[in-house]
Amino acid sequence: MNLADGRAPRKTAGNRMSGLLQAEEEDDFYKTTYGGFNEESGDEEYNEDRSASEDEVDSDFDIDEGDEPTSDHEEDEPKKKRRVVTKAYKEPIQLLKPKPKKPEAPPNTAAKSRPEKPQEPPDDTVDSRKQMRQSTTEHTRQTFLRVKERQIQSKKKKGPHLDRPLTQEELLEEAKITEEINIRSLENYERLEADRKKQVHKKRRCAGPTIRYHSMVMPLITELRMKEENVDVEGLDHEQTDRTHAGKCSRSFITFSDDETFERFFPRSKRGKFSVRDVCPVTHKPALYRDPITDIPYYNSKAFKIIRDAYKKYITTHGLPNAAMATTMGPSADAAQRNTRQKIIIKQSVPSA
């Protein structure tokens, strides 16, 4: 690792460099080669010409590109030729003594020293002509000539325009021609109108049953409540009742063309026979049960006992209803009838608790 990289620089570094440069020996190479490079005074004339030319160039910038020079004699003046003077180079003499400072000249001295040229009075006609270039004026002149020639040629082709009034015969002939043209146009119009009517599609009427759906806005139906009004007999004013405006609602209607279509979409259901509900003779309530012997409906167990007690009393007094039937029918009863009667008797003889 280099120690010089980490070392801090000295405070007096570079103090003697200016003295070494001043004590440096002059080299003869710069004095002999190419005639020497020592500077010589004597360029005052060159500097004056250059400053004058620079002033002239600056003044030219004020003129627009499209404007022509104000005076014609300025173009005839000979242009000054700039010459470049090359002299031998001489090394400047280095002096240890400080050079005295020159007083600064005011910047506007050169501008004031220049003689001001008297301005020529402006001429409107000259300025307007000089603002346009020669090429522009030439093109404008040629265009004007071409337009004029075309106008002359068009007048020659048209010939003289005669404004002679027409005679009565000429007017009648012209009216006949106009009439024929109008008749032809009318015939064409009628033919086109007939063709258009043929092409119009006629509305087809639906054959057969139809169903029409119609929706509309209708006023809302409200219930009218009658209010009692107190009538004043003495002739005082009656109290006016407030009328509330009813709202509106939407209603839809479906219309069928015939009854058959309506019945096909909305068939009528067959009404069945309504079964009459039995009523208990004891409690006068809807019966829930039925006695198998007497075939009397009853509501609960209490009603059932009352019905059976009445049935027993009827048997003791009047006898069985099947025995009475047997006496009326006589002894020629079939065996089947006897068997059924016996079964009934056995069935009736079993009392239910």
Curated annotation (Swiss-Prot):
GO biological process, one term: transcription initiation-coupled chromatin remodeling
A Pfam family the protein falls into: YL1_C
Gene Ontology MF term list: DNA binding; histone chaperone activity
Endpoints of the signal sequence: none
Annotated GO CC locations: nucleus
Subcellular location as annotated: Nucleus
Stretches with biased composition (Basic and acidic residues): 70-79, 113-143
Residues within the DNA-binding region(s): 155-205
Highest taxon in the source lineage: Eukaryota
Keyword DNA-binding: yes
Keywords: Chromatin regulator, DNA-binding, Nucleus, Transcription, Transcription regulation
Region listing for Disordered, in residue ranges: 1-143
Biased composition (Acidic residues): 54-69
InterPro entries noted in UniProt: Vps72/YL1_C, YL1_N
Role summary: Deposition-and-exchange histone chaperone specific for H2AZ1, specifically chaperones H2AZ1 and deposits it into nucleosomes. As component of the SRCAP complex, mediates the ATP-dependent exchange of histone H2AZ1/H2B dimers for nucleosomal H2A/H2B, leading to transcriptional regulation of selected genes by chromatin remodeling.
Alphabetized PANTHER family for the sequence: VACUOLAR PROTEIN SORTING-ASSOCIATED PROTEIN 72 HOMOLOG (PTHR13275:SF4), YL-1 PROTEIN TRANSCRIPTION FACTOR-LIKE 1 (PTHR13275)
Family affiliation: Belongs to the VPS72/YL1 family.
Binding partners and assembly: Component of the NuA4 histone acetyltransferase complex.
Name of the protein in its database record: Vacuolar protein sorting-associated protein 72 homolog
Organism: Xenopus laevis (African clawed frog)
Name of the encoding gene: vps72
